[in-house]
Amino acid sequence: MALLSKKNKPSQKAYAVVTGAGSGIGRSFALELAKRGGDVICADIDLSSAQETVDLIQSMTSTSAYAVHCDVGLKESVHALAEQAEQLLGYPVTLLINNAGVGLGGKFDEVSLKDWQWCMHVNLWGVIHGCHYFVPKFKQQGFGAIINVASAAGYTAAPEMTAYNVTKSSVLALSETLASELHAYNIAVNVLCPTLVPTNIMKNGRLPSRYSGLADKLLMNHAFTTSDAVVKKTLNRLDAGKLYTIPQPDAKLFWWMKRASPSLYVKLLGLGYPLFNQITK
């Protein structure tokens, strides 16, 4: 097994596991990896959608792809995925993409603890479980790569997204910590932090009724990219040894504003919040 290097890029001819591969960014990751010569495990809680992704891969490439059911919030399910992946691929996994996620919005005091647990179950524990079961394998084989899909929500602190923000900021912190801890083991880490991308996460999320139609309007008018473009940029940055992928202009603007003056940034959000309330009434 060759060590990861500039001559052996993580996204090229990878043996990959992608969670949430049944749609959106996850499907785009699976398709792009197949185009780059990789064999892909398409894991999703919806097995039929994962199979659709596999069918797409098989219709356009000669690489291997497999659909596997996985509830990333259940440690037993992710453990089984880790064991099954190597058996199906016939080779140790070289790239893990923790992508599965759900959307949750609403005022802090209106979001139930049950919904908090649901969001944490998928968005945070799903990533923790993936890293927990694959990192030891990467260490043992002497190389590997991880992409964790977070969100610009992890640092923008947007109102009425508390639970979602908390999960994504945790994924960001986890990724940064793993990058420093795993560097000596030749394990690359990249964390993806996009703003709006046309996917089903908002449509299938748990959002207040007053948000009805808002998600579609935002995606139609303010999505500066596509899931395919985001994925290509992320894989290229992983190959280049970069930790962060912040793909859109607005995501980069928020990133630098927050770092330039954190207190002023949060104050401005608070001043602008009444306008958001007017829009969603």
Where are these regions (language model features)?
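Conserved glycine-rich cofactor-binding loop
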Residues: 15, 22-23
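Conserved glycine-rich Rossmann-like NAD(P)H-binding loop of the short-chain dehydrogenase/reductase
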Residues: 38-52
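The beta1-alpha1 cofactor-binding region of Rossmann-like NAD(H)/NADP(H)-dependent oxidoreductases
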Residues: 47-48, 69-80, 113
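Substrate-binding pocket helix/loop in short-chain dehydrogenase/reductase
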Residues: 107-108, 112-117
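Active-site helix of classical SDR
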Residues: 131, 167
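Residue(s) in the substrate-gating loop at a strand-loop-helix junction
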Residues: 151
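SDR active-site lid
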Residues: 184-249
